[in-house]
A protein has these predicted regions:
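Intrinsically disordered, low-complexity N-terminal segments that are enriched in acidic
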Residues: 1-90
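Generic structural signal for bulky hydrophobic/aromatic residues embedded
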Residues: 57, 76-78, 82, 140, ...
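Extracytoplasmic/secreted proteins, especially bacterial periplasmic and envelope-associated proteins
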Residues: 7, 11, 42, 46-49, ...
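Intrinsically disordered, low-complexity repeat and linker tracts
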Residues: 1-9, 13, 87-111, 137, ...
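Acidic/histidine-rich, surface-exposed loop or edge segments in extracytoplasmic proteins
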Residues: 23-36, 89-102, 113-124
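Cysteine-centered nucleophilic/redox motifs
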Residues: 137, 167-201
Length: 201
């Protein structure tokens, strides 16, 4: 990332973390004085790089994001104002068709409860070797969830959402399961909480 991109990364990371915890709008605006992009093409290129970095670094915080739809960009040359709108998955969208870019606060609160379960798993293996911790995290995930064969089939009509996220892994409900992406995000999240392991999925 460029120096400006790094600043944008930290700004968006803070906002996205807040949305994950409390819900709210996923429409962001900023001015050229904050992030000096000269053209819309420059903005789009940098935002794509920033978003990819955030998706890799923040598996929990993006549980609400529908990456199959993605984001929308806006660039208003008259006042050098730019906008980034991130699409919310249907399961976490605030009621009303106008809320494509708003996370329901109650659903965000419910999602935040899974953090306690994840932290408890990390605490269980604290002080053990790196190998023991990695194996322990893998085993715990496999005990908590099964592969969601239905969601993996071409004819699945449920849309992109929780089967691809880590929420279903730690929600304590054995009827909610995930596909490969959900397993991977859950494993990375435990490694991130561990603090002593570096994991890139």
């Amino acid at each position: 990332l460029s120096e400006t991109g790094k600043i944008l990364y930290e700004d968006l990371k803070g906002k996205i973390s807040g949305i994950a915890e409390n819900g709210g709008s996923t429409e962001f605006t900023f001015t050229a004085s904050e992030y000096p992009y000269s053209t819309e093409a420059d903005l789009v290129k940098e935002v794509k790089a920033v978003l990819q970095a955030l998706l890799s670094d923040c598996p929990y915080e993006f549980y609400w994001y529908d990456k199959t739809v993605g984001m929308q960009y806006g660039w208003y040359s008259t006042n050098s104002l730019a906008s980034i709108n991130l699409t919310v998955a249907g399961a976490y969208r605030a009621s009303g068709t106008e809320n494509t870019y708003k996370v329901d606060s109650a659903k965000a609160t419910a999602a935040a409860n899974v953090k306690a379960k994840a932290n408890a798993i990390v605490a269980t293996y604290k002080g053990q070797s790196a190998y023991a911790r990695l194996k322990g995290y893998k085993d715990e995930i496999c005990k908590l969830v099964s592969y969601n064969d239905a969601a993996a089939k071409p004819g699945y009509t449920g849309g992109y959402g929780d089967p691809w996220q880590l929420i279903y892994v730690f929600d304590g409900d054995d009827t909610t399961n995930v596909v490969c992406e959900g397993y991977a995000k859950a494993f990375q999240y435990l490694c991130d909480l561990d603090g002593g392991l570096t994991c890139y999925i």
